[in-house]
Amino acid sequence: MFDVLMYLFETYIHNEPEMRVDQDQLTDDLAQAGFHRDDIYNALNWLEKLADLQEGENAPYFMDADPLAMRIYTEEEGVRLDASCRGFLLFLEQIQVLNLETREMVIDRVMALDNTEFDLEDLKWVVLMVLFNIPGYESAYQQMEELLFEVNEGYLH
């Protein structure tokens, strides 16, 4: 499913954000690109749930949290998000790329992935996808994009 999300983000969403695509046509295009239908449906469902999180009432755990409180991760979250991932999320909060709500959206979407393997690079892409899908967070998205691509470019040299 994560491969489908990455492909969608790089091919459709990031390059043509205003483009409207028929879901059936998109499913067929992705199947022709070699993705399994189950992965395609799971990825599209993942994106729908991301859109639902923006509504607020679908994620009531955002509402009562104290912004100064320290986030304690559940055992399952700690397994999926290792120390480097959790540290990176804290770093993103400290530099104000993420806030309480967007951090929780990222964690929610990470936990919804069906990957058995998940690392810091995957987390960076999930953060980018979440920020891209929230109106008004263009600056945070741009900062995250710079962080992602500056680090990746450093490996090429």
Curated annotation (Swiss-Prot):
Belongs to the Smg family. The lineage of its organism: Bacteria, Pseudomonadati, Pseudomonadota, Gammaproteobacteria, Enterobacterales. It comes from Serratia proteamaculans (strain 568). HAMAP family: Smg. This is Protein Smg. NCBIfam families: PRK03430.1. Disulfide bonds: none annotated. It comes from the Bacteria. It holds the Pfam family DUF494. Signal peptide: none annotated.
